[in-house]
From Swiss-Prot:
<protein>
    <recommendedName>
        <fullName>Pyridoxal 5'-phosphate synthase subunit PdxT</fullName>
        <ecNumber>4.3.3.6</ecNumber>
        <ecNumber>3.5.1.2</ecNumber>
    </recommendedName>
</protein>
<dbReference type="InterPro" id="IPR002161">
    <property type="entry name" value="PdxT/SNO"/>
</dbReference>
<comment type="pathway">
    <text>Cofactor biosynthesis; pyridoxal 5'-phosphate biosynthesis.</text>
</comment>
<feature type="binding site">
    <location>
        <position position="105"/>
    </location>
    <ligand>
        <name>L-glutamine</name>
    </ligand>
</feature>
<feature type="binding site">
    <location>
        <begin position="46"/>
        <end position="48"/>
    </location>
    <ligand>
        <name>L-glutamine</name>
    </ligand>
</feature>
<comment type="similarity">
    <text>Belongs to the glutaminase PdxT/SNO family.</text>
</comment>
<keyword id="KW-0378">Hydrolase</keyword>
<dbReference type="GO" id="GO:0005829">
    <property type="term" value="C:cytosol"/>
</dbReference>
<keyword id="KW-0315">Glutamine amidotransferase</keyword>
<dbReference type="GO" id="GO:1903600">
    <property type="term" value="C:glutaminase complex"/>
</dbReference>
<feature type="binding site">
    <location>
        <begin position="138"/>
        <end position="139"/>
    </location>
    <ligand>
        <name>L-glutamine</name>
    </ligand>
</feature>
<feature type="active site" description="Nucleophile">
    <location>
        <position position="78"/>
    </location>
</feature>
<comment type="subunit">
    <text>In the presence of PdxS, forms a dodecamer of heterodimers. Only shows activity in the heterodimer.</text>
</comment>
<dbReference type="GO" id="GO:0036381">
    <property type="term" value="F:pyridoxal 5'-phosphate synthase (glutamine hydrolysing) activity"/>
</dbReference>
<comment type="function">
    <text>Catalyzes the hydrolysis of glutamine to glutamate and ammonia as part of the biosynthesis of pyridoxal 5'-phosphate. The resulting ammonia molecule is channeled to the active site of PdxS.</text>
</comment>
<feature type="active site" description="Charge relay system">
    <location>
        <position position="176"/>
    </location>
</feature>
<feature type="active site" description="Charge relay system">
    <location>
        <position position="174"/>
    </location>
</feature>
Amino acid sequence: MTGILAVQGAFAEHAAVLDKLGAPWKLLRAAEDFDESIDRVILPGGESTTQGKLLHSTGLFEPIAAHIKAGKPVFGTCAGMILLAKKLDNDDNVYFGALDAVVRRNAYGRQLGSFQATADFGAADDPQRITDFPLVFIRGPYVVSVGPEATVETEVDGHVVGLRQGNILATAFHPELTDDTRIHELFLSL
């Protein structure tokens, strides 16, 4: 079952995509919600600083950190990518520190800087490659540098906006805000 962090942000939109795919899910609002039924986690878009504080005050930080450390699947979108990053280049906070990348918060600026694009997700020789995926950015981050453990999955205008590292999937964009379910399907296959 997929646990969706539901302390702030676009958790309802991720739940709607999983419903569309017939995949079971559970909202994670407090530590007691994270039980043995959770085998994968979604960290949704939203405001990363707020989510970081709420992860600690709800007691969810430790069980999610243990889940990630155990190599179980996790998918971070926008703020979720920030929460997963080993380092932020414009913020001293580090949250889970699991994704071998340096990420820039709010790299695409203010709300008015939000935009849409289309790109492929995955390497050209990857059998799971997703072509022509619609990307929705809302004040999104992007990746400033990628370490050797992570693999670039997609770029827009020369900026890395999608990464994979083992069972970690991270996007600067919001696939849950489109009608295309393929990236969620990829996550469910991990």
